[in-house]
C-alpha cells in the first residue's frame, strides 16, 4: 500500500474515533419530551421515579406512574409539586442510608 493510501486510511480511522465520542443529539436520550405537566392528583400516584442528570440526559426527570393503568406522566421538575416530591424522596433516602 502506498504512503498516500496509508494516510487516507489513517485519517478515516482517526475521524471515526473522534466522531464516536460525540453525542448524536444534544441532551441525549431523555425519557421526558418537553417540560412535563405541572401537577398530578396525589390520589392517582402509584409510583414516583426520579432520574437525575447523566451523560445521556442533562436534566432531572420526575416520572409519575399513575394508578389504574392510566400510564405515566412526566412532571415538570421546576413545578412546585415536583420540587416537593424530590425533596421528600431525598429526605427518605438520606434517612435510609443514615442508619447504615
From Swiss-Prot:
InterPro entries: Chemokine_b/g/d (IPR039809), Chemokine_CXC (IPR001089), Chemokine_CXC_CS (IPR018048), Chemokine_IL8-like_dom (IPR001811), CXC_Chemokine_domain (IPR033899), Interleukin_8-like_sf (IPR036048). Residues 1-21 form the signal peptide. One of its GO terms (cellular component) is extracellular space. SMART domains: SCY. Pfam families: IL8. It is found in: Secreted. One of its GO terms (molecular function) is heparin binding. Its main location: secreted. Chemotactic for interleukin-activated T-cells but not unstimulated T-cells, neutrophils or monocytes. Induces calcium release in activated T-cells. Binds to CXCR3. May play an important role in CNS diseases which involve T-cell recruitment. May play a role in skin immune responses. This is C-X-C motif chemokine 11. It comes from Bos taurus (Bovine). The lineage of its organism: Eukaryota, Metazoa, Chordata, Craniata, Vertebrata.
Amino acid at each position: 500500500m502506498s504512503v498516500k493510501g496509508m494516510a487516507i486510511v489513517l485519517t478515516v480511522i482517526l475521524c471515526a474515533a473522534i466522531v464516536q465520542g460525540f453525542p448524536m443529539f444534544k441532551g441525549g436520550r431523555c425519557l421526558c419530551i418537553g417540560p412535563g405537566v405541572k401537577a398530578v392528583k396525589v390520589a392517582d400516584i402509584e409510583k414516583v421515579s426520579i432520574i437525575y442528570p447523566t451523560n445521556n440526559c442533562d436534566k432531572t426527570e420526575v416520572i409519575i406512574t399513575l394508578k389504574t393503568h392510566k400510564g405515566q406522566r412526566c412532571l415538570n421538575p421546576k413545578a412546585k409539586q415536583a420540587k416537593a416530591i424530590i425533596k421528600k424522596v431525598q429526605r427518605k433516602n438520606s434517612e435510609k442510608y443514615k442508619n447504615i
